[in-house]
């Protein structure tokens, strides 16, 4: 076989593979495909230096890993703001157009799958990373290479991040679950879980069998010069990526609503699960001008589809004990399929709601589920009662530890601080991101450690040894050392994160920061009048903090002594031209904008990402763009970086 013949056969094999795996429309028999596949493989084994990067043989799974490594996105992968009605869409449009004027909008289906970031370097697929926390995800490149709708090579120089959704078709999802049931394995709850679970297989040959599909929806790092997102996406589609079955350019709320209703009408026909429609400002310059909140881009939102209702029957009511001791009733229901998700539980919130709705065991009820929202019961079908239904009694003793419960009406609490369920949930909260961020200490491991008697409270984490973990099922040398290293690394964390991690009722991240700055380690002895004097801290929060410290003072002091948290210093900015001012930065400065932002915040300024009439100063560097133009049109004072420094 000559090299030209080899290239032609690779081209044919790619066409056949795409038709079979992506379009679900085979154009060759299995025998023909296998024969051609092995001809190509034989040539590549004899001439490995001539093997093409995008040959279908490169996709076959078989690589087995011990674990996944963490990898950082070049540009952050953001979440999206959700809207649920035409009125909420109009509010969102009003906010957008108030800042940047009339816009073109790019609308497309929102597929329900696992978000993925593909990094290409000079056209070759270099890395595939899960969304993770938006900054860091898990590298799953070997698994993603098995997805036929992911090109291994594209026509692009330099680095480009192509973001999209990995999904499973509805028919394939049902087939996978049938196979899992036959093998004695638990079925996946929904296609999203199936896609995510398939991507996290340590053996890539398992992923290869799952027939995953990748739909691109956005771009991170890139040097494309198109002025609109839709134009950039046309370039991406032209590289061999799948185009969504429908997408639309819209200009008004009526255009948007019409396309939204059209997608709803196609919901059952489209082979992938959709849970809404994504609306994006199309013009790149306006996207940059709108910027981002802490969580979302201001230039895009997800218009979620209506909740789906189903009728089912309550089999039993079980009780869950949270970290604060609150007892939450959960309805165990006859399993029902809602939009591809098998639902077997629904939240009941509290016992007052059970009494208000007169919910009984054996009742037929209507439940709804919308997106990621936990299914809930909306109505009891009283006309279907037979008389055999059993009223639900308010519990008097904890289902886990048996201690007497405190009934406060809507809330019923277990007051035993050593209740195993309270301990487990307290430690899970303590270890999660935004708190102590102990990597690898997930819910299953916490449950195992508590049930095996290795830990009884948070403090016990910091005295765990290799020997404590060596005899536990599933704990190998590397896993043990990684966990112990992660626990040790959490020492010295900022005090506000430790306060958040303690799980004090009503005290969230923002309040924890304010308390840490005001009191430092003296928070254990803080007085009521000093607490409520802090901006944003009310009576309920103050009382909650005081009660927590009264009960747990000695434990908190031991935590401080063990963890030695970093105490942030409260520095009152001296009088300066920027104290209390709203400032916007734009253009290239002599040092990173992050450092200049930090400097201005230390001076008491609030640094915003967008220009408005409320902006006091726009400070600009080289290649300043639309923010500077908008400031000038609004009459907002503008300063060069040198002028800003001169004012100081």
UniProtKB/Swiss-Prot annotation:
It catalyses: NAD(+) + (deoxyribonucleotide)n-3'-hydroxyl + 5'-phospho-(deoxyribonucleotide)m = (deoxyribonucleotide)n+m + AMP + beta-nicotinamide D-nucleotide. InterPro entries: BRCT_dom, BRCT_dom_sf, DisA/LigA_HHH, DNA_ligase, DNA_ligase_AS, DNAligase_adenylation, DNAligase_N, Hlx-hairpin-Hlx_DNA-bd_motif. Its EC number is 6.5.1.2. GO terms for biological process: DNA repair; DNA replication. Transmembrane segments: none annotated. Residues 573-648 form the BRCT domain. Keywords: DNA damage, DNA repair, DNA replication, Ligase, Magnesium, Manganese, Metal-binding, NAD, Zinc. It comes from the Bacteria. NAD(+) binds at residues 30-34, 79-80, 108, 131, 165, 280, 304. Its cofactor is Mg(2+); Mn(2+). GO terms for molecular function: DNA binding; DNA ligase (NAD+) activity; metal ion binding. The keyword Membrane does not apply. GO terms for cellular component: cytosol. Belongs to the NAD-dependent DNA ligase family. LigA subfamily. NCBIfam families: dnlj, PRK07956.1. This is DNA ligase. It comes from Sulfurovum sp. (strain NBC37-1).
């Amino acid at each position: 076989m000559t090299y030209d013949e080899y290239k032609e056969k690779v081209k044919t094999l790619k066409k056949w593979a795409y038709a079979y795996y992506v379009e679900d429309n085979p154009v060759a028999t299995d025998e023909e495909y296998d024969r051609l596949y092995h001809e190509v493989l034989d040539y590549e084994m004899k001439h490995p230096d001539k093997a093409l990067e995008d040959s279908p043989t490169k996709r076959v799974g078989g690589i087995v890993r011990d674990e996944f490594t963490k990898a950082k996105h070049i540009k952050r992968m953001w979440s999206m703001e959700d809207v649920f009605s035409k009125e909420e869409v109009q509010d969102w449009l009003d906010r957008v157009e108030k800042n940047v004027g009339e816009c073109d909008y790019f609308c497309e289906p929102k597929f329900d799958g696992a978000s993925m970031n593909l990094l290409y370097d000079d056209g070759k697929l270099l890395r595939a990373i899960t969304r993770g926390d938006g900054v860091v995800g898990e590298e799953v490149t070997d698994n993603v290479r098995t997805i036929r709708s992911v090109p291994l090579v594209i026509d692009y120089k330099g680095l480009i991040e192509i973001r999209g959704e990995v999904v499973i078709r509805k028919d394939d999802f049902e087939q996978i679950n049938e196979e899992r049931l036959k093998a004695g394995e638990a079925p996946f709850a929904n296609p999203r879980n199936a896609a995510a679970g398939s991507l996290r297989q340590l053996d890539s040959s398992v992923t290869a069998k799952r027939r995953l599909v990748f739909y691109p929806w956005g771009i991170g790092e890139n040097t494309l010069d198109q002025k609109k997102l839709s134009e950039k996406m046309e370039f991406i589609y032209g590289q061999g990526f799948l185009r969504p079955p429908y997408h639309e350019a819209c200009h008004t709320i009526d255009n948007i609503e019409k396309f939204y209703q059209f997608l709803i009408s196609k919901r059952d026909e489209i082979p992938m699960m959709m849970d809404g429609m994504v609306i994006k400002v199309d013009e790149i310059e306006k996207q940059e001008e709108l910027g981002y909140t802490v969580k979302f881009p201001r230039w895009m939102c997800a218009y979620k589809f209506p909740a789906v209702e189903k009728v089912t029957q309550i089999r039993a009511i079980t009780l869950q004990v949270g970290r604060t001791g609150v007892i939450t009733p959960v309805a165990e229901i006859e399993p029902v399929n809602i939009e591809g998700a098998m639902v077997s539980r629904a939240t009941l919130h509290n016992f007052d709601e059970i009494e208000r709705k007169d919910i009984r065991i054996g009742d037929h009820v209507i439940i709804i589920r919308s997106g990621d929202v936990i299914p809930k019961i909306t109505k009891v079908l009283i006309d279907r009662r037979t008389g055999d239904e059993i009223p639900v009694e308010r519990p008097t003793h904890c289902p886990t530890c048996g201690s007497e419960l405190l009934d406060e009406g809507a809330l019923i609490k277990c007051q035993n601080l050593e209740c195993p369920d309270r301990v487990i949930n307290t430690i899970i909260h303590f270890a999660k991101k935004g708190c102590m961020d102990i990597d690898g200490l997930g819910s299953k491991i916490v449950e195992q450690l508590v049930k095996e008697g290795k830990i009884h409270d948070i403090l016990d984490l910091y005295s765990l040894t290799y020997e404590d973990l060596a005899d536990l099922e599933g704990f190998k040398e590397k896993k043990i050392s990684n966990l112990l290293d992660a626990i040790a690394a959490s020492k010295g964390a900022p005090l506000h994160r430790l306060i958040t991690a303690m799980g004090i009722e009503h005290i969230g991240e923002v309040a924890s920061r304010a308390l840490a700055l005001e009191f430092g380690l003296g928070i254990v002895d803080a007085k009521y009048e000093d607490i409520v004097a802090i901006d944003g801290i009310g009576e309920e929060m103050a009382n909650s903090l005081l009660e927590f410290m009264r009960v747990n003072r000695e434990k908190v002091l031991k935590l401080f002594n063990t963890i030695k948290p970093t105490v942030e210093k409260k520095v009152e900015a001296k009088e300066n031209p920027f104290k209390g001012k709203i400032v916007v930065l734009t253009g290239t400065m002599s040092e990173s904008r992050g450092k200049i932002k930090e400097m201005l915040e230390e001076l008491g300024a609030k640094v915003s990402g967008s220009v408005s009439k409320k902006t006091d100063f726009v400070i600009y560097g080289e290649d300043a763009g639309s923010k500077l133009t908008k400031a000038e049109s609004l009459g907002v004072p503008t300063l060069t970086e040198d002028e800003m420094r001169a004012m100081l």
